[in-house]
């Protein structure tokens, strides 16, 4: 009987350690994905903090956005008015 209780206790401790390890790995990965909003500076000047905050902003290149096509293929039953043209992605429906 004590052997069974010891085995269950060891399994529970192992499970707790595994869960904590996974929790900290996910926490660190999510923490690393966030960018710092401002740099902490001792005796900071508000202008420097504003510059540090805005210097880390990323610019989005317009070339990275996929070109949208105007789709005329959306039609309804003959008794209804046709839908206005819409912008759809090339890979829509995939």
UniProtKB/Swiss-Prot annotation:
Keyword annotations of the record: Secreted, Signal
Domain of life: Eukaryota
Protein's cellular compartments: Secreted
Main location: secreted
Secretion signal span: 1-21
Record's keyword annotation contains Zinc: no
Record flagged with keyword Signal: yes
Family, per entry: Belongs to the FAM24 family.
Protein name, as recorded: Protein FAM24B
Organism expressing this protein natively: Homo sapiens
Gene coding for it: FAM24B
């Amino acid at each position: 009987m004590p052997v069974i209780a010891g085995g269950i206790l060891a399994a529970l401790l192992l499970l707790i350690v595994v869960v904590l390890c996974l929790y900290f790995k996910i926490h660190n990965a999510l923490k690393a994905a966030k960018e710092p909003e401002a740099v902490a500076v001792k005796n900071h000047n508000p202008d420097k903090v504003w510059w540090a905050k805005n210097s880390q902003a990323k610019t989005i290149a317009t070339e990275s956005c996929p070109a949208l096509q105007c789709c005329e293929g959306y039609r309804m039953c003959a008794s209804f008015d046709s839908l206005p043209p819409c912008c759809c992605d090339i890979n829509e429906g995939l």
